[in-house]
């Protein structure tokens, strides 16, 4: 029987097939843990007298609540006592149960969905879970990456399994070659605008087509990362030579004969030619351009060349009311060209766009320039390793000379759970993944953008792409 990529990975991990509508029991290959969704899970283990089932398949890092400045301060000196408590609790739980932890200040600390791939822990054909919705990131490797809740975190810690009902499958085909300046972030924002924030509900999305195959692994991670914003449980890309080249030589990747055997298996992880998807969506990648959001959900986006929608032109009452509410919160008027929207802050970071390629791309835009006087710019690498690599390449110097704030690794301004937050009414061009009301701080207004658009926006002070910029003025004349 012909099968899709998702079905192959699923079938390879069924420990017990569900009967009479019951869920299947899946084996979990990798469990990633952080400080926010794990405390009650460890409490449950402790109360039941259970150990962690597979310490070798469990790894923890501190990311959501971590400060991105003054990281050497004791946790007791953090202003947010809830954050300090969660970080301290994770350290105590990992020490008690023997879980490997990369804490603040560790050479491998960082956002969990950056750390896993860079260590080579995420590999094709795996099942990967974490108490975080953006675990879909790991599907870029041809793995089944799923966000889970705290009770499920406890179940995996205790049994290394998870009961789940099979998902439907949807093919997202992006044909053609992307134009210069159009990135993976623009592709996924366009996909979400096309199918809506609920369009993927109940599905695993498989991204296919020439435009997807031509992406780097970091670009594929950006795409899969935001599958959840389309309502999907997971997103996947079939592994290929790009995948293998990224993984080879990483600390936890197979070595020697084991590598050869792994690659042989990984090559089988592709959708069969005659397999059928439950739904299919096709986009012309060559027609895509830089994309930005205007509203309060990731599906409320338009090309940068477009304008804010005009509610009076929308016939559906429910849709019109939703647009009106979003515009009121965002402080925007219908019909405003997107390029006329001024921002107060630019944030480059998050598990969506904080990897070395993202930082290189943004640095190339701002090199030799100065930021707009009206804008503050915050650049937060996704991991300590990414930060060190960027500094070795001189990228930190480029950002500092531009006038940006160069920070330590963490989730930072992606979410209002640490000191990096927007003030009420403050408008931000952000490379993160969610623009909900209050996501980056109470009353904060978020426009989701690519690193290229973020960098150009920081130069002009209004939503912009690199094509909008004049050549930088030479500094040696």
From Swiss-Prot:
Coiled coil: none annotated. SUPFAM superfamilies: Aconitase iron-sulfur domain. One of its GO terms (molecular function) is metal ion binding. Binds 1 [4Fe-4S] cluster per subunit. Pathway: Amino-acid biosynthesis; L-leucine biosynthesis; L-leucine from 3-methyl-2-oxobutanoate: step 2/4. GO terms for biological process: L-leucine biosynthetic process. [4Fe-4S] cluster binds at residues 351, 411, 414. It is an enzyme of class 4 (lyase). Its EC number is 4.2.1.33. Its cofactor is [4Fe-4S] cluster. InterPro entries: 3-IsopropMal_deHydase_lsu (IPR004430), Acnase/IPM_dHydase_lsu_aba_1/3 (IPR015931), Acoase/IPM_deHydtase_lsu_aba (IPR001030), Aconitase_4Fe-4S_BS (IPR018136), Aconitase_4Fe-4S_dom (IPR036008), IPM_dehydratase_rel_enz (IPR050067), IPMI_cat (IPR033941). PROSITE patterns: ACONITASE_1 (PS00450), ACONITASE_2 (PS01244). It comes from the Bacteria. Keywords: 4Fe-4S, Amino-acid biosynthesis, Branched-chain amino acid biosynthesis, Iron, Iron-sulfur, Leucine biosynthesis, Lyase, Metal-binding. It catalyses: (2R,3S)-3-isopropylmalate = (2S)-2-isopropylmalate. It holds the Pfam family Aconitase. Catalyzes the isomerization between 2-isopropylmalate and 3-isopropylmalate, via the formation of 2-isopropylmaleate. Belongs to the aconitase/IPM isomerase family. LeuC type 1 subfamily. PANTHER family: 3-ISOPROPYLMALATE DEHYDRATASE, HOMOACONITASE, MITOCHONDRIAL-RELATED. Heterodimer of LeuC and LeuD. HAMAP family: LeuC_type1. This is 3-isopropylmalate dehydratase large subunit. The gene is leuC.
């Amino acid at each position: 029987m012909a099968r899709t990529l998702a079905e192959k990975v699923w079938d390879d991990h069924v420990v017990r097939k569900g009967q009479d509508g019951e869920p299947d029991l899946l084996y979990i290959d990798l469990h990633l843990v952080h400080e926010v969704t794990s405390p009650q899970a460890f409490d449950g283990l402790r109360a039941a007298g259970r150990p962690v089932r597979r310490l070798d398949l469990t790894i923890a890092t501190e990311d959501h609540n971590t400060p991105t400045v003054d990281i050497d301060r004791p946790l007791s000196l953090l202003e947010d006592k809830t954050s300090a408590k969660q970080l301290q609790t994770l350290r105590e739980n990992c020490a008690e149960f023997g879980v490997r932890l990369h804490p603040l200040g560790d050479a491998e600390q960082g956002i969990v969905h950056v750390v896993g791939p860079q260590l080579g822990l995420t590999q094709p054909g795996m099942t990967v879970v974490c108490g975080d919705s953006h675990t879909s990131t790991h599907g870029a490797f041809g793995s089944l990456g799923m966000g889970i809740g705290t009770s499920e975190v406890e179940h995996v810690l205790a049994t290394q399994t998870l009961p789940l009902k099979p998902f439907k499958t949807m093919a997202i085909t992006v044909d053609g070659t992307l134009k210069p300046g159009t990135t993976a972030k623009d592709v996924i924002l366009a996909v979400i605008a096309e199918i809506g924030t609920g369009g993927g509900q109940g599905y695993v999305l498989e991204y296919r087509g020439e435009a997807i195959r031509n992406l780097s692994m970091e670009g594929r991670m950006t795409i899969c990362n935001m599958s959840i914003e389309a309502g999907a449980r997971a997103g996947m890309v079939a592994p290929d030579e790009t995948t293998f080249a990224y993984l080879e030589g990483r600390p936890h990747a197979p070595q020697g004969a084991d590598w050869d055997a792994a690659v042989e298996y990984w090559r089988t992880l592709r959708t069969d030619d005659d397999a059928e998807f439950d739904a299919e969506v096709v986009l012309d990648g060559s027609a895509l351009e830089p994309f930005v959001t205007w509203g309060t959900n990731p599906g409320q986006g338009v090309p940068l060349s477009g304008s804010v929608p005009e509610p009076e032109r929308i016939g559906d009452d429910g849709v019109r009311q939703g647009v009106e509410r979003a515009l009121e919160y965002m402080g925007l008027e219908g019909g405003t060209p997107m390029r006329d929207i001024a921002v107060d802050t630019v944030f480059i970071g998050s598990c969506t766009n904080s990897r070395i390629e993202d930082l290189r791309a943004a640095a190339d835009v701002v090199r030799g320039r100065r930021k707009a006087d009206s804008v503050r710019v915050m650049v937060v690498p996704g991991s300590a390793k990414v930060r060190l690599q960027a500094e070795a390449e001189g990228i930190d110097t480029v950002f500092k000379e531009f006038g940006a704030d160069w920070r330590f690794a963490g989730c930072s301004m992606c979410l209002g759970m640490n000191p990096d937050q927007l003030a009420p009414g403050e408008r931000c061009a952000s490379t993160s993944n969610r623009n909900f009301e209050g996501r980056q701080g109470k009353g904060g207004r978020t426009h989701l953008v690519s690193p290229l658009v973020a960098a150009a926006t920081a130069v002009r002070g209004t939503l912009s792409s690199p094509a909008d910029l004049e050549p930088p003025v030479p500094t040696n004349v």
